[in-house]
Structures are given as C-alpha cells and as structure tokens.
C-alpha cells in the first residue's frame, strides 16, 4: 500500500492493517502522482503476481483468488475480467471478450483492436500480471504522462505474454466520479495528445506481432476517433 501524501485518515487505517497482517506493507511518500506511487509499489513488490487497486474503488472478495486460479490453471501470463461500473445508485457490468477463453497473444490482439479505447483493455485494475515479466522488461509507469499511463503499460506488457485468460465474471467495482477528463480545453488537449501517443504504441505493437497489415484499418480507427474528438470540441 502506497500513501501518496494522503490528507485524510486512510494512512492510519493502512498502518493498522500492516501491523495486523505482515502480508501488507505500507510506504508513505510525499504526493508525487499516481505513476510515482505505482512505481514505488513495483519496487517493493514480491511474489509471483501483480494486481492493482485504485484507492477509491472496491474489489470483489474473491477477485484475487479467481484471477490467480485462472492464471495457474490455464498457464496465462495475463488474466483480465469483467467489472462493475458504478455511477451513484446505478451499477452495470462492463467487459468485451465473451465467455471464459484462453487466447494466444495474436488472438488477444485481434480482440483488442475491435475496441481499442475500451476500459476493459486499457486499465490496470481488472487484470493480473506476472511480476517476472514486468521486471524482466523493466516496465514502469511514465511519470510525465498525465493520463493513460496504464494503457501504455498494458501495451508494452502484451509484447511479452504468451497466453491471455479472459474471465467473464465481474470482479472489480469501478466507482464513477463527478467530472470528466475532457471537461476543460486543457484536459481535452492532454486527452488528444495521449490518444496520439497511444496510437503510436498500438501501431508498433501490431507491427511487432506481424498483424499490422491485417489490422491496419482498425488500428487507424483509434486515430480517427481522436480527430473526431478534436472536431466536436471546436
């Protein structure tokens, strides 16, 4: 657990948990942003797998058990699940790959490009990663990237996976909060810049997988969505 300069009582709660259960480790640091906090956690992490949880969301009590079981039973390097999107009193299941499936890296890439901007693929918190892959590739989060650093991390991680397991069960509660990333012109500009950067990562990934010629039209669909976002904001 990383306390990234919190100002409420959450640090004390985490400290009590760390005392009560040695599996929990607490790191306190001055506020440096989400990427710095995640990188600090990766440096301290041990064990076989990595799982991320945002501080103001919730996970299903059986989330970790379910994801680890899928990884072990299927020999997967990446496991991802459906999730709940919670907006006030409303709760909806979100996901993309249907049913329980085991996919090769190329098969997964073909599924991902069908919905390249989908949270299901871009976020960290509905996934389980092998720590050995993260460390062998030296993967860390880009501190200078203001938004979408998790998507870039995922696109880099996928390069090294052999098999991907999809679990259709929703195991995470993503709490929708007031406000929008594109509510101001400044954040809109950052969003567009991030989408352009993500497009470059996408293009490089599909070229490395020898899928670019096959999937070129779908890859460029992501870039076109960026142009549409800019046009509709004028």
What are these regions (language model features)?
Residues 3-12:
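A conserved acidic beta->alpha catalytic loop
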Residues 24:
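Short, conserved active-site loop motifs that form the nucleotide-linked donor/cofactor pocket
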Residues 29-45:
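Glycine-rich, basic loop-to-helix element that forms the pyrophosphate-binding segment
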Residues 231-234:
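Conserved small/polar residues in nucleotide/adenosyl-binding loops
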Residues 220-228:
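Amphipathic alpha-helical repeat scaffolds of TPR domains
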Residues 50:
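Short aromatic/hydrophobic "clamp" motif used to bind/position activated sugar donors
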């Amino acid at each position: 657990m990383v306390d990234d300069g919190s100002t409420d009582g959450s640090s004390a709660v985490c400290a009590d948990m760390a005392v009560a259960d040695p599996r929990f480790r607490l790191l306190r640091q001055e506020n440096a942003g989400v990427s710095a906090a995640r990188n600090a956690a990766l440096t301290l992490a041990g064990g076989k797998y990595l799982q991320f949880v945002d501080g103001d969301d919730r996970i299903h009590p059986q989330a970790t058990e379910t994801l680890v079981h899928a990884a072990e039973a299927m020999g997967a390097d990446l496991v991802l699940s459906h999730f709940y999107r919670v907006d006030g009193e409303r709760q909806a299941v979100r996901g993309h790959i249907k049913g329980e499936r085991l996919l090769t890296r190329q098969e997964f890439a073909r599924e991902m490009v069908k919905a390249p901007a989908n949270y299901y693929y871009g976020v960290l918190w509905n996934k389980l990663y092998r720590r050995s892959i993260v460390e062998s590739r030296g993967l860390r989060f880009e501190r200078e990237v203001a938004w979408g650093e998790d998507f870039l991390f995922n696109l880099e991680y996928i390069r090294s996976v052999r098999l991907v397991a999809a679990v259709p069960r929703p195991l995470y509660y993503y709490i929708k909060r007031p406000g929008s990333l594109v509510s101001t012109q400044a954040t809109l500009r950052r969003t567009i810049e991030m989408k352009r950067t993500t497009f470059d990562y996408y293009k490089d990934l599909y070229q490395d997988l020898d899928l670019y010629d096959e999937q070129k039209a779908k890859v460029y669909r992501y870039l076109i969505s960026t142009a549409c976002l800019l046009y509709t904001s004028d």
